Amino acid sequence: MAKIEFVGIDEYLEKLNKIGDKTTGLCKRALYDGAAVLADAVRSEVQALPVTDRNTEPQQVLSYERDGLLAGLGIAKMKDDGGVVSTRVDFDGYNRLKSKTYPNGHPNSMIARAINSGTSKRKKNPFMSRAVAKAKAKAESAMSARMDADINEIMK
């Protein structure tokens, strides 16, 4: 009968256990890199929105709406829901147009949804869908590169 002898298997198993212990942290770092790529794509799409300073053209975005979206764009805190790590690129805060209904200003997330999906008075401009389509492959490769680099660092 043949005999096989492995050398260094204990060290290899120890490194694999280190990766297993740090999985959530590794995933969060990789996810953040992917979200950063997506946030950059969304920012460029928001900057490319057609802008006007008059409220008479329904398909146009008002300049203060775009400025509010750019100021409120960010990456949300990471959530760990039973081993599923997630985050989102979203719009936070308010723009400068105050009203009786919105004394702090209109919520940027509401403005983004209205621009993206359209309303009865505004033609839709799906900038988020375009940003996701443009950035998906780059975000996946950024996450993969981060994960590979972190795993290679542990496996040294």
Where in the sequence are the language-model features?
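Long amphipathic alpha-helical coiled-coil rod/stalk domains
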Residues: I19, T23-L26, A30, G34, ...
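Phenylalanine-focused residue identity feature
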Residues: F6, F91-Y94, F127
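Alpha-helix initiation and N-capping motif
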Residues: F6-I9, A39, R66, N108, ...
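N-terminal, Lys/Arg- and Ser/Thr-rich interaction peptides
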Residues: M1-G25
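Short, low-complexity, charged/polar segments at coil/turn and helix-coil boundaries
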Residues: E14, D21-G118, M155-K156
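Lipid-handling modules and contact-site tethers
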Residues: S109-K156
